[in-house]
Protein backbone atom coordinates (compact mmCIF):
# COMPACT_ATOMS: atom_id res chain seq x y z
CA UNK A 1 0.00 0.00 0.00
CA UNK A 2 2.86 2.37 0.81
CA UNK A 3 4.36 1.94 -2.69
CA UNK A 4 0.96 2.40 -4.32
CA UNK A 5 0.62 5.74 -2.50
CA UNK A 6 4.09 6.63 -3.77
CA UNK A 7 3.04 6.03 -7.37
CA UNK A 8 -0.01 8.24 -6.92
CA UNK A 9 2.10 10.91 -5.32
CA UNK A 10 4.64 10.83 -8.14
CA UNK A 11 1.90 11.63 -10.62
CA UNK A 12 0.35 14.35 -8.50
CA UNK A 13 2.97 17.06 -8.80
CA UNK A 14 5.26 18.47 -6.11
CA UNK A 15 5.23 20.05 -2.65
CA UNK A 16 7.47 22.48 -0.82
CA UNK A 17 9.12 20.63 2.02
CA UNK A 18 11.36 21.29 4.95
CA UNK A 19 15.06 21.16 4.17
CA UNK A 20 16.89 17.87 4.28
CA UNK A 21 18.82 16.78 7.36
CA UNK A 22 20.90 19.65 8.70
CA UNK A 23 24.63 19.20 8.85
CA UNK A 24 25.77 17.86 12.23
CA UNK A 25 27.70 20.49 14.19
CA UNK A 26 30.67 20.23 16.54
CA UNK A 27 32.19 22.89 18.81
CA UNK A 28 35.86 22.97 19.80
CA UNK A 29 36.88 25.46 22.48
CA UNK A 30 40.41 26.65 21.69
CA UNK A 31 41.14 29.29 24.33
CA UNK A 32 39.19 30.78 27.25
CA UNK A 33 39.63 33.99 29.22
CA UNK A 34 41.25 33.33 32.57
CA UNK A 35 43.46 30.55 31.21
CA UNK A 36 47.24 30.80 31.21
CA UNK A 37 48.55 31.85 27.82
CA UNK A 38 50.77 29.15 26.25
CA UNK A 39 54.24 30.43 25.40
CA UNK A 40 53.89 33.52 27.59
CA UNK A 41 55.63 34.44 30.87
CA UNK A 42 54.39 32.68 34.03
CA UNK A 43 51.13 34.07 35.34
CA UNK A 44 50.02 35.68 32.07
CA UNK A 45 46.35 34.88 31.58
CA UNK A 46 44.01 35.61 28.69
CA UNK A 47 41.87 38.67 29.41
CA UNK A 48 40.23 39.23 26.01
CA UNK A 49 40.18 37.91 22.46
CA UNK A 50 39.75 39.80 19.22
CA UNK A 51 38.36 38.62 15.91
CA UNK A 52 39.43 35.04 15.06
CA UNK A 53 40.00 33.65 11.56
CA UNK A 54 40.09 30.09 10.21
CA UNK A 55 42.24 29.05 7.24
CA UNK A 56 41.77 26.17 4.79
CA UNK A 57 43.75 23.79 7.01
CA UNK A 58 41.28 24.35 9.82
CA UNK A 59 43.79 26.36 11.88
CA UNK A 60 42.36 29.28 13.85
CA UNK A 61 44.38 32.48 14.25
CA UNK A 62 43.36 35.05 16.86
CA UNK A 63 44.66 38.07 18.77
CA UNK A 64 44.84 37.58 22.53
CA UNK A 65 45.08 40.32 25.14
CA UNK A 66 46.87 40.00 28.48
CA UNK A 67 47.25 42.44 31.36
CA UNK A 68 50.77 43.27 30.16
CA UNK A 69 50.91 42.48 26.46
CA UNK A 70 49.41 40.88 23.38
CA UNK A 71 50.05 37.88 21.16
CA UNK A 72 48.78 36.46 17.88
CA UNK A 73 48.11 32.74 18.28
CA UNK A 74 47.43 29.94 15.85
CA UNK A 75 45.91 26.62 16.84
CA UNK A 76 47.81 23.52 15.75
CA UNK A 77 45.70 20.71 17.20
CA UNK A 78 47.45 20.71 20.59
CA UNK A 79 47.92 24.08 22.31
CA UNK A 80 47.71 27.43 20.54
CA UNK A 81 51.14 28.50 19.30
CA UNK A 82 52.48 32.06 19.46
CA UNK A 83 53.17 33.57 16.02
CA UNK A 84 53.76 37.18 17.03
CA UNK A 85 53.99 38.81 20.46
CA UNK A 86 54.65 42.27 21.80
CA UNK A 87 57.92 42.98 23.56
CA UNK A 88 60.04 40.90 21.17
CA UNK A 89 62.47 42.03 18.47
CA UNK A 90 61.10 41.35 14.97
CA UNK A 91 63.41 39.62 12.46
CA UNK A 92 65.79 42.08 10.78
CA UNK A 93 65.66 44.64 13.59
CA UNK A 94 68.37 45.49 16.10
CA UNK A 95 68.48 44.42 19.72
CA UNK A 96 66.43 46.86 21.75
CA UNK A 97 63.89 47.38 18.98
CA UNK A 98 60.58 45.85 20.05
CA UNK A 99 57.13 45.26 18.68
CA UNK A 100 54.86 47.57 20.65
CA UNK A 101 51.11 47.38 20.86
CA UNK A 102 49.28 45.35 18.19
CA UNK A 103 46.51 47.58 16.92
CA UNK A 104 44.53 44.97 15.02
CA UNK A 105 44.56 41.53 13.43
CA UNK A 106 42.98 42.24 10.04
CA UNK A 107 43.52 39.40 7.58
CA UNK A 108 44.22 35.67 7.52
CA UNK A 109 44.14 34.20 4.02
CA UNK A 110 43.41 30.67 2.84
CA UNK A 111 47.02 29.59 3.42
CA UNK A 112 47.13 31.05 6.92
CA UNK A 113 49.23 34.13 6.08
CA UNK A 114 48.52 36.92 8.56
CA UNK A 115 48.06 40.67 8.11
CA UNK A 116 48.16 42.95 11.15
CA UNK A 117 48.84 46.53 12.24
CA UNK A 118 51.33 47.17 15.05
CA UNK A 119 53.78 49.75 16.36
CA UNK A 120 57.56 49.27 16.31
CA UNK A 121 59.44 50.89 19.20
CA UNK A 122 63.14 51.63 18.67
CA UNK A 123 65.82 51.18 21.27
CA UNK A 124 67.64 54.38 20.21
CA UNK A 125 64.59 56.52 21.08
CA UNK A 126 63.66 57.15 17.43
CA UNK A 127 59.96 57.93 16.97
CA UNK A 128 57.63 54.96 17.26
CA UNK A 129 56.12 53.94 13.90
CA UNK A 130 52.77 52.33 13.18
CA UNK A 131 53.03 49.83 10.36
CA UNK A 132 51.33 47.12 8.37
CA UNK A 133 52.96 43.71 8.87
CA UNK A 134 52.60 40.25 7.41
CA UNK A 135 53.45 36.87 8.88
CA UNK A 136 54.14 33.85 6.67
CA UNK A 137 55.34 30.45 7.81
CA UNK A 138 58.36 30.53 5.51
CA UNK A 139 59.26 34.20 6.04
CA UNK A 140 58.17 35.08 9.56
CA UNK A 141 57.12 38.61 10.50
CA UNK A 142 57.83 41.39 7.99
CA UNK A 143 57.01 45.08 7.92
CA UNK A 144 55.30 46.14 4.68
CA UNK A 145 54.64 49.86 5.14
CA UNK A 146 55.02 52.42 7.93
CA UNK A 147 53.47 55.79 8.58
CA UNK A 148 56.20 58.42 8.63
CA UNK A 149 58.50 56.66 6.14
CA UNK A 150 58.85 57.48 2.45
CA UNK A 151 56.07 56.26 0.22
CA UNK A 152 57.49 54.29 -2.74
CA UNK A 153 57.26 56.15 -6.06
CA UNK A 154 56.99 59.54 -4.36
CA UNK A 155 59.14 62.08 -2.51
CA UNK A 156 56.67 62.26 0.39
CA UNK A 157 55.94 60.00 3.34
CA UNK A 158 53.05 57.76 4.24
CA UNK A 159 50.65 59.44 6.65
CA UNK A 160 50.90 58.01 10.15
CA UNK A 161 48.20 57.10 12.60
CA UNK A 162 46.35 54.79 10.18
CA UNK A 163 43.40 57.19 10.19
CA UNK A 164 39.88 56.31 9.11
CA UNK A 165 40.81 56.39 5.43
CA UNK A 166 43.56 53.77 5.76
CA UNK A 167 42.72 50.37 4.30
CA UNK A 168 44.67 47.36 3.14
CA UNK A 169 43.88 44.00 1.57
CA UNK A 170 45.79 40.70 1.49
CA UNK A 171 45.59 38.15 -1.31
CA UNK A 172 45.51 34.39 -0.86
CA UNK A 173 49.13 34.31 -2.02
CA UNK A 174 50.25 37.02 0.43
CA UNK A 175 50.25 40.17 -1.75
CA UNK A 176 49.27 43.34 0.08
CA UNK A 177 47.41 46.32 -1.43
CA UNK A 178 47.50 49.52 0.66
CA UNK A 179 45.36 52.65 0.44
CA UNK A 180 46.78 55.68 2.27
CA UNK A 181 47.41 59.42 2.02
CA UNK A 182 50.70 61.28 1.63
CA UNK A 183 51.98 63.62 4.33
CA UNK A 184 54.96 65.91 4.72
CA UNK A 185 56.59 68.19 2.15
CA UNK A 186 54.81 67.91 -1.20
CA UNK A 187 52.37 65.34 0.12
CA UNK A 188 49.31 67.60 0.14
CA UNK A 189 47.23 64.79 1.66
CA UNK A 190 47.02 63.07 -1.74
CA UNK A 191 45.56 59.58 -1.99
CA UNK A 192 47.60 56.64 -3.17
CA UNK A 193 47.40 52.88 -3.69
CA UNK A 194 50.47 50.68 -3.35
CA UNK A 195 50.89 46.92 -3.86
CA UNK A 196 53.55 44.43 -2.77
CA UNK A 197 54.70 41.09 -4.06
CA UNK A 198 53.52 37.86 -2.44
CA UNK A 199 56.05 38.11 0.40
CA UNK A 200 54.93 41.60 1.41
CA UNK A 201 58.10 43.05 -0.14
CA UNK A 202 58.84 45.39 -3.08
CA UNK A 203 55.98 47.78 -2.40
CA UNK A 204 55.14 49.63 -5.64
CA UNK A 205 53.04 52.69 -6.38
CA UNK A 206 49.90 51.72 -8.31
CA UNK A 207 48.15 55.08 -8.60
CA UNK A 208 48.43 58.58 -7.09
CA UNK A 209 45.86 61.36 -6.93
CA UNK A 210 46.39 64.41 -9.21
CA UNK A 211 49.04 62.72 -11.27
CA UNK A 212 49.06 61.68 -14.95
CA UNK A 213 48.03 58.06 -15.37
CA UNK A 214 48.40 55.37 -18.01
CA UNK A 215 44.83 54.17 -17.47
CA UNK A 216 43.74 56.24 -20.49
CA UNK A 217 45.93 58.48 -22.70
CA UNK A 218 46.36 62.10 -21.57
CA UNK A 219 44.38 61.77 -18.35
CA UNK A 220 44.93 62.54 -14.67
CA UNK A 221 43.39 60.79 -11.68
CA UNK A 222 41.41 63.20 -9.51
CA UNK A 223 39.85 60.82 -6.98
CA UNK A 224 39.59 57.12 -6.13
CA UNK A 225 38.61 54.91 -3.24
CA UNK A 226 40.35 52.04 -1.47
CA UNK A 227 41.07 48.95 -3.62
CA UNK A 228 38.06 46.68 -4.04
CA UNK A 229 39.88 43.35 -4.32
CA UNK A 230 43.26 41.69 -4.88
CA UNK A 231 43.65 38.15 -6.20
CA UNK A 232 46.38 35.52 -5.86
CA UNK A 233 48.13 36.82 -8.99
CA UNK A 234 48.48 40.23 -7.35
CA UNK A 235 45.85 41.91 -9.55
CA UNK A 236 44.44 44.95 -7.76
CA UNK A 237 40.97 46.27 -8.67
CA UNK A 238 40.07 49.90 -7.93
CA UNK A 239 37.80 52.66 -9.17
CA UNK A 240 38.87 56.16 -10.26
CA UNK A 241 37.57 59.50 -11.52
CA UNK A 242 39.57 60.90 -14.43
CA UNK A 243 39.99 64.24 -16.16
CA UNK A 244 41.68 65.11 -19.42
CA UNK A 245 41.23 64.69 -23.16
CA UNK A 246 37.75 63.47 -24.10
CA UNK A 247 36.63 63.12 -20.47
CA UNK A 248 33.11 64.31 -19.57
CA UNK A 249 30.77 63.77 -16.63
CA UNK A 250 29.22 60.92 -18.59
CA UNK A 251 32.45 58.89 -18.93
CA UNK A 252 34.84 60.04 -16.20
CA UNK A 253 34.37 57.04 -13.88
CA UNK A 254 36.24 53.78 -14.49
CA UNK A 255 37.04 50.50 -12.80
CA UNK A 256 40.59 49.35 -13.43
CA UNK A 257 42.73 46.30 -12.82
CA UNK A 258 46.50 46.54 -12.25
CA UNK A 259 49.30 44.07 -11.68
CA UNK A 260 53.07 44.33 -11.76
CA UNK A 261 53.39 42.26 -14.95
CA UNK A 262 50.76 43.87 -17.19
CA UNK A 263 50.11 47.32 -15.76
CA UNK A 264 46.62 48.81 -16.14
CA UNK A 265 43.52 47.56 -17.89
CA UNK A 266 40.05 49.11 -17.95
CA UNK A 267 37.41 46.63 -16.75
CA UNK A 268 34.35 48.88 -17.11
CA UNK A 269 33.79 52.58 -17.79
CA UNK A 270 30.70 54.71 -17.45
CA UNK A 271 29.30 55.60 -20.87
CA UNK A 272 30.76 52.53 -22.59
CA UNK A 273 28.49 49.92 -24.23
CA UNK A 274 27.48 47.07 -21.91
CA UNK A 275 28.55 43.62 -23.18
CA UNK A 276 25.62 41.42 -24.17
CA UNK A 277 23.28 44.36 -24.79
CA UNK A 278 22.64 46.45 -27.93
CA UNK A 279 25.42 49.03 -28.54
CA UNK A 280 23.09 51.84 -27.47
CA UNK A 281 22.84 50.43 -23.92
CA UNK A 282 25.65 51.86 -21.80
CA UNK A 283 26.95 51.82 -18.24
CA UNK A 284 25.18 54.53 -16.24
CA UNK A 285 26.73 53.67 -12.88
CA UNK A 286 29.24 50.95 -12.01
CA UNK A 287 28.54 49.67 -8.51
CA UNK A 288 31.35 47.17 -8.06
CA UNK A 289 33.96 44.97 -9.75
CA UNK A 290 35.77 41.89 -8.44
CA UNK A 291 38.53 39.71 -9.92
CA UNK A 292 38.96 36.29 -8.27
CA UNK A 293 41.85 33.84 -8.00
CA UNK A 294 40.85 32.18 -11.29
CA UNK A 295 41.24 35.55 -12.99
CA UNK A 296 37.49 35.77 -13.63
CA UNK A 297 35.74 39.13 -13.38
CA UNK A 298 32.35 40.14 -11.99
CA UNK A 299 30.75 43.53 -12.73
CA UNK A 300 27.66 44.88 -11.00
CA UNK A 301 26.19 47.98 -12.66
CA UNK A 302 23.19 50.12 -13.52
CA UNK A 303 22.66 50.50 -17.27
CA UNK A 304 20.72 52.93 -19.45
CA UNK A 305 19.52 53.18 -23.04
CA UNK A 306 16.61 52.32 -25.32
CA UNK A 307 14.33 49.65 -23.84
CA UNK A 308 15.81 49.99 -20.35
CA UNK A 309 13.52 51.05 -17.50
CA UNK A 310 14.07 51.54 -13.79
CA UNK A 311 12.43 48.16 -13.18
CA UNK A 312 15.23 46.25 -14.96
CA UNK A 313 18.26 48.52 -15.16
CA UNK A 314 20.56 46.67 -12.72
CA UNK A 315 22.71 43.83 -14.06
CA UNK A 316 25.41 41.43 -12.90
CA UNK A 317 27.97 40.47 -15.56
CA UNK A 318 30.83 37.97 -15.55
CA UNK A 319 33.38 36.45 -17.91
CA UNK A 320 33.44 33.17 -15.93
CA UNK A 321 32.33 31.08 -18.93
CA UNK A 322 35.27 32.21 -21.05
CA UNK A 323 33.19 34.29 -23.45
CA UNK A 324 34.07 37.74 -22.17
CA UNK A 325 31.74 39.75 -19.95
CA UNK A 326 28.14 38.67 -20.39
CA UNK A 327 24.86 39.08 -18.54
CA UNK A 328 24.34 36.60 -15.67
CA UNK A 329 21.55 38.13 -13.57
CA UNK A 330 19.33 41.14 -14.08
CA UNK A 331 16.77 43.14 -12.16
CA UNK A 332 13.28 42.11 -13.25
CA UNK A 333 14.11 38.40 -13.58
CA UNK A 334 11.88 35.77 -11.97
CA UNK A 335 12.93 35.26 -8.35
CA UNK A 336 13.98 31.63 -7.72
CA UNK A 337 11.70 29.50 -5.54
CA UNK A 338 9.10 32.29 -5.45
CA UNK A 339 5.58 32.41 -6.95
CA UNK A 340 5.36 33.19 -10.69
CA UNK A 341 5.59 36.91 -11.28
CA UNK A 342 7.70 37.62 -8.19
CA UNK A 343 10.75 39.38 -9.59
CA UNK A 344 14.17 40.53 -8.44
CA UNK A 345 14.51 44.27 -7.74
CA UNK A 346 17.04 46.64 -6.15
CA UNK A 347 20.13 44.41 -6.38
CA UNK A 348 22.74 45.21 -3.73
CA UNK A 349 25.84 43.81 -2.04
CA UNK A 350 27.11 41.38 -4.68
CA UNK A 351 29.73 38.74 -3.73
CA UNK A 352 32.00 36.68 -6.01
CA UNK A 353 34.00 33.71 -4.73
CA UNK A 354 37.02 31.89 -6.13
CA UNK A 355 34.85 29.30 -7.87
CA UNK A 356 33.22 32.20 -9.72
CA UNK A 357 29.93 31.69 -7.92
CA UNK A 358 27.77 34.73 -7.22
CA UNK A 359 25.70 35.76 -4.21
CA UNK A 360 23.75 38.97 -3.77
CA UNK A 361 21.01 40.76 -1.87
CA UNK A 362 17.88 42.18 -3.45
CA UNK A 363 14.23 43.00 -2.94
CA UNK A 364 11.36 40.90 -4.28
CA UNK A 365 8.30 42.95 -5.16
CA UNK A 366 8.06 44.37 -1.66
CA UNK A 367 9.99 45.70 1.29
CA UNK A 368 11.75 42.48 2.37
CA UNK A 369 15.45 42.03 1.65
CA UNK A 370 16.51 38.66 0.22
CA UNK A 371 19.90 36.93 0.13
CA UNK A 372 20.53 34.67 -2.89
CA UNK A 373 23.44 32.36 -3.62
CA UNK A 374 24.74 29.95 -6.25
CA UNK A 375 26.50 27.96 -3.54
CA UNK A 376 23.88 25.24 -3.02
CA UNK A 377 22.04 23.30 -5.73
CA UNK A 378 22.75 24.26 -9.35
CA UNK A 379 21.60 27.76 -10.17
CA UNK A 380 20.57 30.64 -7.95
CA UNK A 381 18.79 29.67 -4.73
CA UNK A 382 17.15 31.42 -1.81
CA UNK A 383 19.21 31.72 1.40
CA UNK A 384 17.36 34.06 3.75
CA UNK A 385 15.06 37.08 3.84
CA UNK A 386 14.02 39.71 6.33
CA UNK A 387 10.77 38.82 8.04
CA UNK A 388 11.48 35.09 8.22
CA UNK A 389 11.68 33.18 11.47
CA UNK A 390 15.21 32.37 12.58
CA UNK A 391 16.53 29.38 14.54
CA UNK A 392 18.26 29.46 17.89
CA UNK A 393 15.60 30.81 20.27
CA UNK A 394 12.72 29.26 22.21
CA UNK A 395 10.44 32.22 21.48
CA UNK A 396 9.81 33.36 17.90
CA UNK A 397 12.37 35.77 16.50
CA UNK A 398 12.43 37.15 12.97
CA UNK A 399 15.26 38.49 10.85
CA UNK A 400 14.73 42.25 10.62
CA UNK A 401 17.82 43.31 8.65
CA UNK A 402 21.08 42.13 7.14
CA UNK A 403 23.97 44.16 8.49
CA UNK A 404 27.28 44.57 6.71
CA UNK A 405 30.39 46.43 7.74
CA UNK A 406 30.38 50.22 7.75
CA UNK A 407 33.54 52.15 8.59
CA UNK A 408 33.14 53.34 12.16
CA UNK A 409 29.73 51.70 12.43
CA UNK A 410 30.86 48.77 14.51
CA UNK A 411 28.56 46.30 12.80
CA UNK A 412 31.21 43.67 12.20
CA UNK A 413 32.78 42.06 9.14
CA UNK A 414 31.29 41.76 5.69
CA UNK A 415 29.40 38.54 4.91
CA UNK A 416 31.74 35.68 4.02
CA UNK A 417 30.99 33.80 0.79
CA UNK A 418 33.24 30.75 0.87
CA UNK A 419 34.49 28.80 -2.13
CA UNK A 420 32.29 25.92 -0.95
CA UNK A 421 29.32 28.23 -1.46
CA UNK A 422 28.42 28.92 2.17
CA UNK A 423 27.23 32.35 3.27
CA UNK A 424 28.10 33.58 6.75
CA UNK A 425 26.42 36.85 7.66
CA UNK A 426 25.38 39.09 10.52
CA UNK A 427 21.69 39.76 10.98
CA UNK A 428 19.63 41.83 13.35
CA UNK A 429 16.68 39.97 14.82
CA UNK A 430 13.74 40.90 17.03
CA UNK A 431 10.47 39.54 18.39
CA UNK A 432 8.44 41.79 16.07
CA UNK A 433 5.63 42.55 16.35
CA UNK A 434 5.58 41.34 19.97
CA UNK A 435 8.46 43.55 21.13
CA UNK A 436 10.31 45.31 18.30
CA UNK A 437 12.65 46.90 20.85
CA UNK A 438 14.02 43.46 21.79
CA UNK A 439 16.70 43.40 19.10
CA UNK A 440 19.81 41.25 18.96
CA UNK A 441 22.59 40.60 16.50
CA UNK A 442 23.34 37.04 15.49
CA UNK A 443 25.65 35.30 13.04
CA UNK A 444 24.22 32.74 10.63
CA UNK A 445 25.57 30.27 8.10
CA UNK A 446 23.73 28.65 5.21
CA UNK A 447 24.72 25.01 5.57
CA UNK A 448 25.12 22.34 2.88
CA UNK A 449 21.59 21.07 3.43
CA UNK A 450 20.15 24.51 2.71
CA UNK A 451 19.28 25.34 6.30
CA UNK A 452 20.01 28.61 8.07
CA UNK A 453 22.02 27.92 11.22
CA UNK A 454 22.78 30.14 14.20
CA UNK A 455 26.54 29.74 14.54
CA UNK A 456 26.45 29.62 18.35
CA UNK A 457 22.83 29.38 19.51
CA UNK A 458 22.05 30.96 22.88
CA UNK A 459 21.92 28.36 25.59
CA UNK A 460 24.57 26.19 23.93
CA UNK A 461 26.64 24.52 26.63
CA UNK A 462 30.36 24.18 25.98
CA UNK A 463 33.01 22.42 28.03
CA UNK A 464 35.92 24.86 28.29
CA UNK A 465 38.07 22.58 30.45
CA UNK A 466 41.43 21.40 29.14
CA UNK A 467 41.73 18.81 31.93
CA UNK A 468 40.37 15.35 31.02
CA UNK A 469 37.71 14.17 33.45
CA UNK A 470 37.20 17.65 34.94
CA UNK A 471 34.49 19.33 32.86
CA UNK A 472 33.86 23.07 33.09
CA UNK A 473 30.51 23.68 31.42
CA UNK A 474 29.54 27.22 30.44
CA UNK A 475 26.45 28.53 28.69
CA UNK A 476 26.45 30.80 25.63
CA UNK A 477 24.77 34.13 26.34
CA UNK A 478 21.92 34.86 23.94
CA UNK A 479 22.34 38.62 24.13
CA UNK A 480 26.07 38.73 23.36
CA UNK A 481 27.34 40.41 20.22
CA UNK A 482 29.93 38.10 18.71
CA UNK A 483 32.38 38.51 15.90
CA UNK A 484 32.56 35.58 13.50
CA UNK A 485 35.91 36.07 11.88
CA UNK A 486 35.72 33.85 8.86
CA UNK A 487 34.66 30.55 7.38
CA UNK A 488 36.55 28.05 5.23
CA UNK A 489 35.68 25.58 2.49
CA UNK A 490 35.40 22.73 5.00
CA UNK A 491 32.34 24.45 6.53
CA UNK A 492 34.22 25.58 9.62
CA UNK A 493 33.65 28.96 11.26
CA UNK A 494 35.89 30.77 13.73
CA UNK A 495 33.82 32.60 16.33
CA UNK A 496 33.93 34.27 19.71
CA UNK A 497 31.58 32.85 22.31
CA UNK A 498 30.47 35.00 25.23
CA UNK A 499 29.15 33.12 28.25
CA UNK A 500 26.55 33.95 30.89
CA UNK A 501 29.27 34.17 33.59
CA UNK A 502 31.05 37.00 31.73
CA UNK A 503 33.89 34.90 30.33
CA UNK A 504 34.56 34.35 26.63
CA UNK A 505 36.29 31.84 24.38
CA UNK A 506 37.59 31.28 20.87
CA UNK A 507 35.55 28.49 19.33
CA UNK A 508 35.88 26.51 16.10
CA UNK A 509 32.42 25.58 14.83
CA UNK A 510 32.51 22.66 12.37
CA UNK A 511 29.60 21.47 10.26
CA UNK A 512 30.11 17.85 9.18
CA UNK A 513 28.82 16.73 5.79
CA UNK A 514 25.16 15.84 6.00
CA UNK A 515 24.41 12.24 5.07
CA UNK A 516 21.37 12.92 2.90
CA UNK A 517 20.80 9.24 2.10
CA UNK A 518 20.39 8.47 5.82
CA UNK A 519 16.70 9.39 5.81
CA UNK A 520 15.81 7.43 8.95
CA UNK A 521 18.59 9.14 10.90
CA UNK A 522 20.30 6.02 12.27
CA UNK A 523 23.75 7.22 11.19
CA UNK A 524 24.11 4.82 8.26
CA UNK A 525 23.03 4.67 4.63
CA UNK A 526 21.27 1.31 4.34
CA UNK A 527 18.39 -0.29 2.37
CA UNK A 528 16.09 0.67 5.24
CA UNK A 529 16.53 4.29 4.16
CA UNK A 530 14.67 3.57 0.91
CA UNK A 531 11.50 2.81 2.86
CA UNK A 532 12.16 5.89 4.98
CA UNK A 533 12.52 8.01 1.84
CA UNK A 534 9.23 6.65 0.43
CA UNK A 535 7.50 7.56 3.70
CA UNK A 536 9.08 11.01 3.62
CA UNK A 537 7.93 11.46 0.03
CA UNK A 538 4.35 10.47 0.77
CA UNK A 539 4.28 12.84 3.77
CA UNK A 540 6.20 15.66 2.04
CA UNK A 541 8.49 15.47 5.07
CA UNK A 542 12.08 16.35 5.83
CA UNK A 543 14.35 13.86 4.07
CA UNK A 544 12.40 13.78 0.82
CA UNK A 545 14.37 16.61 -0.80
CA UNK A 546 17.54 14.78 -1.87
CA UNK A 547 18.69 17.13 -4.64
CA UNK A 548 18.43 20.31 -2.56
CA UNK A 549 16.04 22.20 -4.81
CA UNK A 550 13.63 22.90 -1.95
CA UNK A 551 10.90 20.69 -3.47
CA UNK A 552 9.66 17.11 -3.11
CA UNK A 553 9.52 15.67 -6.65
CA UNK A 554 10.10 12.38 -8.50
CA UNK A 555 13.62 13.61 -9.28
CA UNK A 556 14.48 13.17 -5.61
CA UNK A 557 14.32 9.38 -5.96
CA UNK A 558 17.18 9.40 -8.48
CA UNK A 559 19.03 11.84 -6.22
CA UNK A 560 18.55 9.49 -3.25
CA UNK A 561 20.05 6.61 -5.27
CA UNK A 562 23.10 8.77 -6.08
CA UNK A 563 23.46 9.87 -2.45
CA UNK A 564 23.10 6.25 -1.30
CA UNK A 565 25.79 5.04 -3.70
CA UNK A 566 28.09 7.83 -2.51
CA UNK A 567 27.75 6.51 1.03
CA UNK A 568 28.11 8.41 4.31
Protein language model annotation of sequence segments:
Residues 1-3:
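N-terminal secretory signal peptides that target proteins for export/translocation
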Residues 5-16:
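Bacterial N-terminal signal peptides
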Residues 511-568:
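Cellulosome-associated attachment modules in secreted, modular CAZymes
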Residues 6, 51, 124, 516, ...:
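Exposed boundary/loop context
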Residues 8, 78, 98, 398, ...:
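Short linear sequence elements within intrinsically disordered, low-complexity coil regions
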Residues 18-20:
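Intrinsic low-complexity/disordered segments
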Residues 22-514:
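Conserved "turn/edge" positions that cap or connect secondary-structure elements
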